[in-house]
C-alpha cells in the first residue's frame, strides 16, 4: 500500500528540562596496594638476618637480592658455593655484599640453616631451590625452633575489592586439623595480625553454614573455638563461627540471613576447616577477585618464607616484610616483658 501526502512537523517552543544526573562514583582499586603498605610499614625496621637455603638458581638469588635492596633482609646464602656463584654469574648478580656458607648439597644446606637459627645467627629461613618438604623436615626435627605451639601456614591476600589485607589459614600444612591444632593455627594468625598493626583482629571461623550441627563437625569445632576464646584459651582477637564464607565476607549477606555478627563483613582472618577448603578459597579469590597471594610459615621461633617469588616480586617482598614485622614484633614484646 503506497500513501501520498504531506505531514506537518512542529518543534516545541522550549525543550524539556531534565534533572541533573548525580556524579558517577569512581573507586580506583589498585592491585597490590595493600602489599605496598605492608612493605612501607616494615621500612623503618632494621633488616633481618635471613638464611637463603640452597639458592642455586637465578630466581632464588634475584629474589634475595631484591629483598636486600629493599632493606628488608640481610641475606646469608647457604648451599654449594660453586653452584651459587655459577647461578649468580648467569643472572649477572654481584654476591660480594653477602656471606656464603658452603655446604655439600641441599640436605646439608637445610641442616646448616636450621642449626644457624638454633644458634641465633639468623632470624628467618627462606627456601631457595629445594623442596619445601626437605627444608621442613629439618625444621620439624629441631625442637628449639618448633617452640610450644604447632607450626602453621598462613596466606596473606591482597584483594583489590577489600579495604585491607586478609589472612587465610591453614591452607597448606594441616590437612584435617584437630580442635587443638585449630586453636594453635588461629593463635599463630592472631600473632601475625598484631605484628601487622591490627590490634584486635576479627576471626571468621568458616564452615558451610552458620547453624551448629553434628552433621558438619567443622560447625561444632567453630562453636567450641569461640567458647575457648571466651575462656581465654585463645587471646587477642574477636572470634565468630561457624560462618559461611558469604556471611564472613559480606555484612549485607549476614543481614539478609539474619545473622548478627561483629565479624561478618569485617574479618581480618579466615580460619578454614581443612587444607582443601582453604586452597579452594584462595584460588577462587585469585581467579575471581584478582587477589594476589603471599605466605609465611609461623608458630616456630623463626618464621619460614616458603617460596621465593621472583615472578611476582611485589608478593615476594611482602613475604619478607611479613617476616620482618613478625620478628621485630616479638623482639619488642620480649623487651616489654623484661622488668626495668
Predicted feature residues:
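Anion-binding alpha/beta catalytic cores of soluble intermediary-metabolism enzymes, centered on
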Residues: 26-263, 267-340
Amino acid at each position: 500500500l503506497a500513501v501520498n501526502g504531506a505531514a506537518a512537523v512542529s518543534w516545541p517552543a522550549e525543550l524539556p528540562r531534565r534533572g541533573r544526573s548525580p556524579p558517577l562514583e569512581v573507586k580506583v582499586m589498585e592491585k597490590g596496594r595493600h602489599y605496598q603498605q605492608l612493605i612501607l610499614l616494615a621500612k623503618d625496621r632494621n633488616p633481618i638476618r635471613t638464611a637463603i637455603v640452597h639458592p642455586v638458581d637465578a630466581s632464588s638469588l634475584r629474589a634475595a637480592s631484591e629483598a636486600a635492596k629493599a632493606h628488608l633482609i640481610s641475606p646469608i646464602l647457604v648451599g654449594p658455593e660453586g653452584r651459587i656463584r655459577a647461578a649468580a654469574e648467569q643472572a649477572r648478580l654481584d654476591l660480594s655484599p653477602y656471606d656464603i656458607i658452603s655446604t655439600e648439597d641441599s640436605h646439608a644446606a637445610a641442616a646448616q640453616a636450621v642449626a644457624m637459627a638454633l644458634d641465633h645467627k639468623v632470624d628467618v629461613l627462606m627456601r631457595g631451590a629445594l623442596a619445601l618438604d626437605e627444608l621442613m623436615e629439618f625444621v620439624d626435627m629441631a625442637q628449639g625452633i618448633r617452640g610450644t605451639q604447632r607450626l602453621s601456614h598462613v596466606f596473606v591476600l591482597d584483594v583489590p575489592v577489600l579495604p585491607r589485607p586478609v589472612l587465610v589459614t591453614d591452607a597448606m600444612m594441616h590437612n584435617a586439623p584437630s580442635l587443638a591444632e585449630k586453636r594453635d593455627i588461629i593463635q599463630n594468625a592472631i600473632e601475625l595480625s598484631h605484628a601487622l598493626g591490627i590490634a584486635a583482629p576479627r576471626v571468621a571461623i568458616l564452615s558451610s553454614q552458620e547453624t551448629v550441627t553434628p552433621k558438619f563437625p567443622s560447625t561444632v569445632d567453630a562453636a567450641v573455638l569461640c567458647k575457648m576464646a571466651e575462656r581465654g584459651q585463645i587471646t587477642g582477637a574477636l572470634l565468630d563461627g561457624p560462618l559461611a564464607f558469604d556471611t564472613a565476607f559480606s555484612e549485607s549477606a549476614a543481614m539478609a540471613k539474619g545473622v548478627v555478627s561483629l565479624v561478618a563483613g569485617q574479618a581480618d582472618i579466615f580460619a578454614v576447616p581443612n587444607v582443601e577448603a582453604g586452597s579452594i578459597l584462595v584460588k577462587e579469590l585469585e581467579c575471581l577477585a584478582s587477589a594476589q597471594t603471599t605466605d609465611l610459615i609461623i608458630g616456630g621461633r623463626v618464621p619460614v618464607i616458603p617460596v621465593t617469588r621472583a615472578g611476582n616480586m611485589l608478593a615476594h617482598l611482602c613475604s619478607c616484610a611479613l617476616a620482618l614485622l613478625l620478628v621485630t614484633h616479638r623482639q619488642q614484646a620480649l623487651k616489654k616483658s623484661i622488668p626495668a
